[in-house]
Amino acid sequence: MTVDLLLGLQWGDEGKGKIVDVLTSKYDIIARFQGGPNAGHTLEFDGIKHVLRTIPSGIFHKTAINIIGNGVVIDPVVFQKELEGLEKFNMDVKSKLLISRKAHLILPTHRLLDAASEASKGKAKIGSTLKGIGPTYMDKTGRNGIRVGDIELADFKERYRTLADKHEAMIAFYDVDMQYNLQEMEAEFFEAVEVLKSLQFIDSEEYLNNAMKAGKSILAEGAQGSLLDIDFGTYPFVTSSNTTAAGACTGLGIAPNKVKDVFGIFKAYTTRVGSGPFPTELFDGDGQTMARVGNEFGAVTGRPRRCGWLDLVALKYAVQVNGVTQLFMMKGDVLSGFDTLKVCTGYKYKGEVVSHLPYNIEEENVTPIFIEKKGWQADLTGMTKYDELPVELKEYIEFIEKEVEVPIKVVSVGPDRTQTILK
């Protein structure tokens, strides 16, 4: 068997959690391959909203095995709270959740380092979630990190102390005013590590490749979005991992030729949390309407999301770097009520009109070129079939398909798993 990938194509918050939840019944294994608790996957069903930070979105299905791959970074404290939240629903998490020994751990001092680094930047802040993600990946690439498998070693606490002491020296270097009680943070951390030890650790690359040989179906779940990729995103306003399709291979230990379908998720408009360029951002009533109707607040941070029109230049770029084979369009219902919609089809850049994503898309460098499409007024939230959708929405969908040259197979018309239309 092969692996299918599910990726966000914008700046995150596209609705991956819901779609994974919808697709899970088709797969034996759901595997998360990068990121950490800075990303929240929101699922809504039976009138209850669930936000997962590290645990894969397939955990709510009875038969699916869920894997946290080597490319993920885990904060034991956040992870423990996530487990406790799931226990309220009488879920047997431990039998369905497997964790790669090669996944790296987020230490309390990683979070402190993150906060100190961001505070020292002043107006040049990149909008970090302050979850310790960046410093953890820095230690990983710097070959200083502590991995899940190290928990099982006799000298784990000594390894921890060596790295934490190094972090404290770095925090002092930033010379920012920070109040914290590291002793309390460490006590909480080591308590959470004991909880983590009660779960099953695996060599995920071995497990997944054996599963494929045994004919198991696998869905690899990405966090955040392609435009936040450390290499291909809007650097430096990006995350610290590879959020694109290639990240699934390195974050799980699967070969590129094992990837079959790449499902790309995007919103019918565009959003972004935190700092960074956003060419189609709206600062008027239309943007406020999108934010209000779409409930655009970060699942983890609670920060309001910036809203704007659909950017086809950025979307085509994301489709290209990921090799997307099918598109899933989310939140079509949010655009109901707009008389006219705008879509960015190009940029004015250095005196020329370009249809590709330039190296630098800061606002002073690019001006979006818009075309207008007719909006629709119908309430989509109760619709269940593609034929029921208003003609204007179908024309909007067909226009996007023509521009990006990839079919849209799913249209989401509401937050619940049942509000999903297959085309």
Regions found by a protein language model. Name each.
Residues 1-423:
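Non-transmembrane, aqueous-exposed alpha-helical and coiled segments at domain scale
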